Amino acid sequence: MAWKDLLVHIDDGTASPGRVAAAIALARAHAAHLTGLYVVAEPELPGFLLSELPAAWHEQTRRQGRERAERAAARFREAAARAGLGADCRIDRGLEGEVSAVVAVHARYADLVILGQADPDEPEPARRPAPEAVVLGCGRPAIVVPYIGVGPTIGERVVVAWDAGREATRAVNDALPLLTKAKSVIVLSANPRPTPAGHGAEPGADIAQHLARHGVTVAVEHIEASDIAVADAILSRLADAGADLLVMGAYGHSRARELLLGGVTRQVLPQMTVPVLMSH
């Protein structure tokens, strides 16, 4: 399926312009419509405290949130207009602890959502969605853009982290609009062992053949690494290959308000330096 409807989360952070630029580049490459989404994060305070605060405080908080959203929306529209791209912007609201859930709901009505990697130096992290929570909740693929920005290309040289599991299979399928345009694709398996329920007799060969039938130029590689070093080995291979995109399954689940992530997913997200396409 082609990507024709993209959603990008925008905010006031220093990384937002780079994320918007990446989203615009993707929208132009796929002749897709782009929507920006700003979520006004309302303070999550105990009910008894909220009731004690004066009405003027509530009004000022709402006004400041609205003004921040409108400024961010204006910057987004200006960037899209400079690129000659058709785009619109939405503004929604949610409690600080519910921003990820709000973004996930909007993402369900897009082909792809573009999110930002968490920046440890950025203030007010509760006002921004957690990429892993959005991916686990939206049922759509996401591209997570590093907070340091991206290079001149996204998806020309791709590494697929392949373990023959359901999540990786979903990620490869969701990434096909990019993979079919890529100049090179490496299917990378860590510690692969032939098993009837997963890797075949020649690990990676089955998915490589499937991709080749879509016209993808693909190579298969295996790496050996301890369980705790798999993420580091994947990231190292990305750098060696000069890759500009990693495709991987998002492993984990959410229970109540607790997010439980698989080890590789948990380790890759904070360390990534190129965009990561994730699906669950």
What are these regions (language model features)?
Residues 44, 97-99, 122, 152, ...:
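Generic structural signal for helix capping and beta-alpha/helix-loop junctions
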Residues 19, 99, 127, 168-171, ...:
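Amphipathic coiled-coil/heptad-repeat helices and related helical stalk/stem segments
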Residues 56-71:
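A short acidic, glycine-rich active-site loop
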Residues 20-29, 102-151, 238-280:
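Gly/Ser-rich helix-loop-strand patches that form or flank binding pockets
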Residues 14, 62-63, 93-96, 119-121, ...:
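Short histidine/acidic/glycine/proline-rich micro-motifs that form metal-
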Residues 1-58, 137, 154-223, 243:
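Small/aliphatic-rich secondary-structure junction motif
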Residues 78-113, 213-246, 253-255, 274:
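Structural beta-alpha unit
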Residues 77, 81, 86, 123-146, ...:
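P-loop/Walker A phosphate-binding loop and immediately adjacent motor/lid segment at beta-alpha junctions
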